[in-house]
């Protein structure tokens, strides 16, 4: 999303009315470690810079570098948590946040992150992530059980219709929980979640998809056989890439794929025990069934259909 839509006047005022020049530089280095206000401004090293001038320079530079939203997120965190044991009261920060929202972003209070307004656009990077950015996320792997048999037994037109319906169901469930559909293959998909309680969002999305497909099999499936899905959810750190191929190489994605292939059954969602114990008891009660593969333990949610 283009930075030119930000007015930045509220940010400049917030900086010069709340922080010293040293603090401004310290905080901008949290999003751009190589930032040098003297090199960027042309001032001789060590030359005194007025507080308001420093605020203008830093805001201009961080905007040019495409890191303005990251900087605002940093200010929000410092205002709420402090820095190095010191509390900061950043005056006018609500106006700074409002300016970003006015520019077309939404704000997630759970993770203190801005993301694109889903009423205007939906992109795989939430309108924020750049290649190399690291985030904590949950990923959901989906596989169509018995895909080759379905393709063999049904006409191409019917397969395209049914799989198109499946994609709509999956996309709606993921996006409605602030996730993104990262890949869609002939027999599977990958969803990513990084906002709100992202692990729970991914798990609930997977459960919803399974139940929606059970209903679809009963009321709208044009194929000769039911469409049965195997799903898994795993969470952890990931380095974002705009390349779908590179994303599939990420450790948490590979673990989700392994989890699905090893432990998931048709019409089931599997999560690792390490992920399960981070969830609330109400959700754990739903995942009361456990499976063990080799030495690994998993929790499984499964829905039975009429002919099972």
Residue ranges of model-derived segments:
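Catalytic beta-strand-to-alpha-helix segment of the class III nucleotidyl cyclase homology domain
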Residues: 3-68, 194-308
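Regulatory cytosolic signal-relay segments
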Residues: 54-134
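Short hydrophobic/aromatic-rich motifs at helix boundaries and adjacent loops
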Residues: 118-119, 139-144, 181-185, 227-231, ...
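Short, structured coil/loop segments at alpha-helix boundaries
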Residues: 83-86, 105-108, 115, 155, ...
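Short, flexible loop segments at the rims of nucleotide/cofactor-binding pockets, characterized by
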Residues: 117, 159, 246
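A broad, low-specificity signal for short, low-complexity segments enriched in glycine/proline
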Residues: 96-103, 151-154, 192-194, 228-232, ...
């Amino acid at each position: 999303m283009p930075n030119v839509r930000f007015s930045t006047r509220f940010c400049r005022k917030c900086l010069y009315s709340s922080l010293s020049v040293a603090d401004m530089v310290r905080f901008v280095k949290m999003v751009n470690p190589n930032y040098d206000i003297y090199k960027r401004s042309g001032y001789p090293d060590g030359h005194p810079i007025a507080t308001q001038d420093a605020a203008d320079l830093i805001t201009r530079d961080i905007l040019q570098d495409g890191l303005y939203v990251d900087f605002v997120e940093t200010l929000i965190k410092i205002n709420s948590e402090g820095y190095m044991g010191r509390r900061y009261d950043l005056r006018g920060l609500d106006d700074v946040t409002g300016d970003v929202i006015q520019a077309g972003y939404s704000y997630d209070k759970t993770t203190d992150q801005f993301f694109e307004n889903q009423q205007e656009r939906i992109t795989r990077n939430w309108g924020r992530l750049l290649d190399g950015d690291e985030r904590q996320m949950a990923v959901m792997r989906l596989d169509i059980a018995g895909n080759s048999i379905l393709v063999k037994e049904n006409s191409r037109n019917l397969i395209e219709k049914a799989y198109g319906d499946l994609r709509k169901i999956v996309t709606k469930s993921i996006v409605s929980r602030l996730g993104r559909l990262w890949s869609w293959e002939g027999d599977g998909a990958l969803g990513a979640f990084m906002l709100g309680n992202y692990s729970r969002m991914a798990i609930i999305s997977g459960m919803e998809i399974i139940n929606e497909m059970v209903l679809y099999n009963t009321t709208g499936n044009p194929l000769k056989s039911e469409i049965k899905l195997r799903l898994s959810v795993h969470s952890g750190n990931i380095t974002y890439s705009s390349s779908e191929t590179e994303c599939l190489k990420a450790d948490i994605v590979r673990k989700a794929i392994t989890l699905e292939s090893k432990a998931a059954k048709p019409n089931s969602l599997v999560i690792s025990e390490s992920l399960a114990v981070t969830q609330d008891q109400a959700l754990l009660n739903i995942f009361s069934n456990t499976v063990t593969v080799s030495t690994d333990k998993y929790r499984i949610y499964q829905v039975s259909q009429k002919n099972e």
